[in-house]
Each structure stands twice: as C-alpha cells, then as structure tokens.
Design a protein with these regions (language model features):
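Conserved metal-phosphate-binding beta-hairpin within the catalytic cores
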Residues: 44-77, 86
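Anionic-ligand binding region
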Residues: 1-17
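Catalytic phosphate/nucleotide-handling subdomain of diverse soluble enzymes
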Residues: 82-95
Length: 113
C-alpha cells in the first residue's frame, strides 16, 4: 500500500505512514551479496568517493539488484539510514563515526606523504 520509493515525508514528516517503518537486514543469496559488494567497491573507486558513501539498491521482480542511487555524503545523524545500516552490520554509532574519521585521517596522511 506504500509507494515503492520513499519521498521527503519518509524521512522528515512524523505523521507519514513511513515514519514507523523499521529497517531490517536483507536476506540475500551469497551470489547477490558478492555482486553487491563488488559493484559498490568498483563504483566507489570510479566515482572517486572518499572515506564513506551509501549505495541504495533494490531488487526487481526477478530478484536482480538495481542501483537506486549513490550518496557520497550521507548524513551522520544517529537515526539516519547510514547509522541504521551500520547497526545492521553490528557496528555501533560511535564505532561508525570512528571508522569514517579514521578513513579520512589515513587518506589525508597518505596524500601528504
């Protein structure tokens, strides 16, 4: 009964029916997982993303992954999609922030070397 793509109200309007939907871990085959990881890593490099990014995928009616968008600068807020995805990977919010900052620090140190 919901539209297939979330709009503005899904993130910012507490009266939206999307507001209380929970993010859950996707149950994907090993093959699909490998494809997604390889694709994200390749795109991360080709798009010259730095330190972190968020890749949003959807499966079509045949179960084929389709890239919805690449967000090279997703929000760091504690209740945002990036933090939710980190939590699903058993990464705490403080640990997520630390990983982002460490990545930037390593990149900057490498650039200066």
């Amino acid at each position: 009964s919901y539209p297939r793509i979330c709009g503005y109200e899904a993130k910012w309007d507490p009266s939206s029916p999307y507001w209380n939907l929970r993010s859950v871990r996707a149950h994907l085959s090993e093959e699909v997982q490998r494809f997604l990881v390889a694709s994200c890593l390749k795109l991360f490099g080709r798009l010259k993303c730095r330190d972190y990014a968020r890749f949003d995928w959807r499966l079509d009616h045949n179960g084929t992954p389709r890239l919805l968008e690449v967000n090279p600068n997703p929000g760091w807020c504690w209740d945002g999609h990036l933090a939710k995805m980190a939590a699903l990977a058993d990464i705490s919010y403080p640990e997520m922030l630390q990983k982002i900052l460490q990545s930037a620090e390593h990149r900057i140190c490498d650039e200066k070397a």
